[in-house]
C-alpha cells in the first residue's frame, strides 16, 4: 500500500510540474521592477522546513532590481534555491551562495552556487531540458522539470540561463535578466 501511495504522490507532483511548465509558456507577464534580494529572503523563509536541522552556511550578496514578473521570478529563485538545498543534502556543512556578477550595464547576472554533488559539464546543455536528470531518482527526488521551467521563464523575460559544475565539488546556475523593463510594457505574452 505504501508503494501505491508513494507512486500516486510522485505522479501528482509530475502532473503539477507539467501543468506549471505548460502555463509558463502561455501566461501573460506582468512587468514591473522586482527587488531580487527581497524575493530571495522570502523564498529562503518559505524553504526553512527543508533546511531545518542542517548545517548550512548561507552567503547572500546584495542583489539588483530587474524588470520582470515578480511571481515568475519567485518561481525561478524557489527552484534554484530548493535545488541547492537538495543537492547539498549529503554535505555535513552545506554552503549556498546567492549573488550577482558585476559589470553588466544592460543585464543583471544572478547566480545560485553550492558545494553539493555537482555534475559533469559534458551534460550541462541537457540540464535545462524537460525530464533530464543528471542524478538517479533514488538519490534525489524531483521530476526533471524544474530547470526547464526556469529556462522558459527567463527566456520569456528576454534573458538567458547557463550552468557550471564539477562532480562532487558543486554547481552554479546563472540567470541573466534585463535590468530595465522591456519596451515600457505592463503586460507581455
For every predicted segment, state its role:
Residues 4, 146, 150:
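Short alpha-helical Gxxx[C/S/T] motif in the catalytic ATP-binding
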Residues 119-131:
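Short conserved segment of the HATPase_c
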Residues 158-164:
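Glycine-rich ATP-binding loops of the HATPase_c
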